[in-house]
Amino acid sequence: MAPPLVGLGPRLDTDYSIWPLAYCQSEMPQDFFGGAIKFSNMGTIRVPMIYTLLVGGEVGGKQHVALVDCGFRNDHWAAKYGFASWEEPRDVLARVGFAPEDVEVILVTHMHFDHIGNFEAFPNAKLYIQIDEYLGWSDIVCSAHQYETEEEKAFIFSSFDPQDLVRAAQGVAEGRVHFIRGDEEVLPGITARLAKDSHTFGSQWFEVQTRNGPFAVVGDVVYWYSNIENMWPPGYHQGSAMNQLSVYRQIRETLKQKIDRVIPGHDPKIWDRHNSWLAPSGNRIAEVNLRQGDTTRKPDVSAQKIIHT
């Protein structure tokens, strides 16, 4: 049973449009995402890097524009891991009719470079981060520079950019960062759920209540649908595999076992499970849910396939 909501009082009648947006792609080993043994020796796969736009709020009330994660800058990471088709947030968001300036809130699932590394592209957005995540990375970065060898640092910094911590600290000083402590309703109908010591120190996923029922935007707590369908953690994480299994159970209970309502971090199968289309860049857009009164952004509406199971 999911913990009770805290923060904004009684549950409201809320509704959100939900668009997962790919902003680049990478060719990576399958067992990195699907897990050792089950996906060992299966070669590589092209996976999307995704952030998810949520637009809505209380029905009949103020409407919000929130982004779950914000990608990374097109800097050394692109060359290090061979990312292809990287695009500016302005071009990506424009496909569903929004601009970076419209984003009020960035809900950071965790502080890996591809999830927090481009928040400065959204000048009006406040960041929501779990305090356990911020303190965990602060501690490990300090320890790495004081005590670790270069070989030991390689794993620590394999997906974390210390400069993102510097920029986040500047955001704290400027009042742009809101720290979450555990479970908290951050916007009407959007609740942060702490997944402590799972993918990272203080990862979180977001339960989104709509008129079509709940959805879960989970970041890398669930890389692929197969992780949560088969209860099999991935091959790469900083936390505990057993803790990840507990989080999978919580998500499944929240969604009443309707796994298609999960928005995973890097699964190309999301494009097949939901109404989606291909941009000229080769990146894709999914339209998982439309709030009441909203209209599809897909150029060809005849192929509409929104799944509400």
Residue ranges and their predicted role:
Residues 2-46, 183-184, 206, 290-307:
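Basic, amphipathic N-terminal segments that precede the first structured/catalytic domain
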Residues 18-20, 51-60, 179-211:
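Core dinuclear metal-dependent hydrolase active-site scaffold
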Residues 25-91, 204-220:
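Conserved beta-strand hairpin/beta-sheet module of binuclear metal-dependent hydrolase folds
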Residues 83-129:
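Active-site metal-binding motif and surrounding structural segment of the metallo-beta-lactamase
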